[in-house]
Amino acid sequence: MTSVSWIQKGTHIAIGTGKGLVQIWDAERTRRLRTMTGHTARVGSLAWNTHILTSGSRDRLIYHRDVRAPDQWLRKLVGHKQEVCGLKWNCEDGQLASGGNDNKLMVWDKLSETPLWKFSDHTAAVKAIAWSPHQRGLLASGGGTADRRIIFHDTVRGAVINEVDTGSQVCNIAWSKNSNEIVSTHGYSQNQIVVWKYPSMTQVVSLTGHTYRVLYLAMSPDGRVVVTGAGDETLRFWNVFGKRPGAREDSDGGGRLSDWGVIR
């Protein structure tokens, strides 16, 4: 198993394998529904846009798959010169961002087989990708150890609008749903989690605790808690963001992550 991604609504989960296969499972019934072919090497990235499942592989290809149809794939995208290591859909605008080990970031419009934009600003692999939920066409990407930057792109105009040197490998990026802030996880040399204020990119807080690079990042549905996973074989939960303005507090009893208190 080399990648996992939940469908936005429902109980289906997609799994990429080291043999180039993409499997769809019903998590509720723990039953495999289908296996899709096409790739010839490991599938390291997956992204959903409703019923469209997109997969990226070490074979440098990207496939769009309509999981409702019997066909193995719907579109094949050729653009990256090395492994595709990051994929992220902007479901509202129908744009797909892809990052590769070739240091390239590409933006594809809907199901087009030709990239809308090609960005060559990074100097290391681009695995970390995130679309802003607050501003149309605002895309953040993070570079690897030889780059260390988070770069912000305007995909309406095809321009770079901002960047910050984080000082270490950028492994993941996620925007806060509740405020105009962004959280990033890092590898060598500090293995930290950082919350930034956008657009000033001033650090709100830097969190340490992991002893190896922080490879995984996920956010709770309410946008308040993030969980990180690292090569030190630990999961850590961080209550980093406040509630959405106007949202009511959950009135359930104890045991919630929010009971642990925010970190700022």
Which ranges hold each PLM region?
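A conserved positional marker within WD40/Gbeta-like beta-propeller blades
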Residues: 12, 21, 40, 61-63, ...
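WD40/WD-repeat beta-propeller blade-loop signature
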Residues: 9, 32, 42, 49-52, ...
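Loop/turn segments within WD40 beta-propeller blades
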Residues: 5-10, 16, 45-52, 87-94, ...
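WD40/WD-repeat beta-propeller blade N-cap
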Residues: 1, 36-43, 77-84, 120-126, ...
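Conserved strand-to-loop turn within each blade of WD40 beta-propeller repeats
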Residues: 16-19, 56-59, 92, 98-102, ...
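WD40 beta-propeller blade-start loop/N-cap
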Residues: 5, 28, 35-38, 48, ...
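WD40-repeat beta-propellers
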Residues: 22-26, 46, 62-67, 87, ...
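Terminal intrinsically disordered, low-complexity extensions flanking WD-repeat/beta-propeller proteins
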Residues: 167-169, 180, 189-192, 199-264
